[in-house]
Design a protein with these regions (language model features):
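Terminal low-complexity tails and localization/encapsulation signals of metabolic enzymes
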Residues: 1-34, 68, 72, 120-138
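Glycine-rich loop-to-alpha-helix module at the N-terminal edge of alpha/beta enzyme cores
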Residues: 31-121
Length: 138
């Protein structure tokens, strides 16, 4: 049996041996067993995310292309809004009307950042620290 919720590591969903009970505060009942990532899984996820940011599939995108991806994400969130609101209601005990409006805001936040993705400008300043960057933002 596959769990409803899984870890996402390096673009793949995977089951997790450790889980915890998520209790709906409104009912006091367990509504789901959630994956509980262990140290190895967290380390693999962090490493995969770090590599993904440096990979040409992401690093090679223009700001405009990244903005288009954020628009697409907003559309996907909007399309899945009823399911996402129900999940959030079960997890937090909030009323569905509240979580529905919050999910709508999430989609709008992504649209906002998608719209400014190619409008932010600044200058990169070289510095003597390999793990840091300095920018002038206007």
């Amino acid at each position: 049996m596959t769990a409803a919720f899984q870890l996402s590591i390096n673009g793949q969903f995977e089951s997790c041996a450790a889980t915890f009970e998520s209790i709906n505060p409104a009912t006091g009942e367990v509504w789901e067993h959630m994956p509980e990532a262990q140290t190895d899984e967290v380390n693999r996820a962090v490493q995969a995310a770090s590599q993904a940011l440096k990979a040409p599939e992401w690093a090679g995108l223009t700001a405009s292309q990244r903005g288009k991806l954020l628009y697409k994400l907003a559309d996907l969130i909007e399309k899945a809004a009823p399911q996402l609101a129900q999940i959030e209601t079960s997890d937090t005990g909030k009323i569905i009307r509240e979580t529905s409006s919050q999910i709508a805001y999430v989609a709008e936040y992504y649209r906002y950042y998608a719209g400014i993705a190619d409008k932010l400008e600044g200058s990169f300043l070289p510095i003597d620290k390999a793990d840091m960057q300095a920018w002038i933002v206007r």
